[in-house]
């Protein structure tokens, strides 16, 4: 009986251990969950690739200083299901971006939604949020 229990535990550990790095990769500890920041900016780059897409954009403050922001979102197949595409943005597009900022204060965050120049709003479901409605 004891050998069966040990064999079961060893098999269970062998199956579960490879998933530990995945949960670390898809953790949300770096983000200020529940806090959102809305800003207007100009797109500098739309990086459309696995495992995550990234939107880079410049935000100008009241004094004219520019801060370069980067927002992470989900993978292309998830984004396609939400109406996004590789051609959603082009450099220079003026957009309104909503992110959950990172905790360390850097100009980065998890992309929640974007209002496009034509007024259309696109919602993002990052790997941490699950599907949007």
Which role does the model predict for each range below?
Residues 102-125:
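OB-fold/S1-family single-stranded nucleic acid-binding modules
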Residues 7-21:
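Bacterial N-terminal signal peptides
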Residues 35-51:
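Structural detector for short beta-strands of small beta-barrel domains
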Residues 81-96:
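Short nucleic-acid-contacting surface segments enriched for D/E, G, S/T with interspersed K/R
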Residues 23-37:
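Short boundary/loop segments of OB/S1/cold-shock single-stranded nucleic-acid-binding domains
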Residues 49-59:
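Short aromatic-glycine-enriched beta-strand elements
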Residues 73-81:
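Short, structured beta-strand/loop micro-motifs enriched in basic residues and often containing a Trp
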């Amino acid at each position: 009986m004891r050998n069966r229990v040990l064999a079961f535990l060893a098999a269970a550990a062998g199956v579960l251990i490879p998933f530990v790095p995945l949960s670390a990769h898809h953790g949300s500890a770096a983000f200020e969950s529940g806090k959102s920041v809305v800003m207007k900016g100009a797109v500098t780059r739309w990086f459309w690739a696995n495992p995550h897409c990234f939107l880079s954009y410049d935000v100008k403050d009241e004094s004219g200083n520019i801060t370069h922001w980067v927002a992470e979102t989900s993978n292309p197949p998830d984004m396609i299901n939400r109406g996004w595409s590789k051609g959603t943005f082009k450099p220079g597009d003026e957009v309104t971006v909503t992110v959950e900022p990172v905790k360390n204060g850097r100009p980065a965050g998890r992309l929640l939604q974007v209002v496009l120049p034509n007024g259309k709003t696109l919602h993002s479901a990052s790997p941490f949020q699950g599907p949007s409605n």
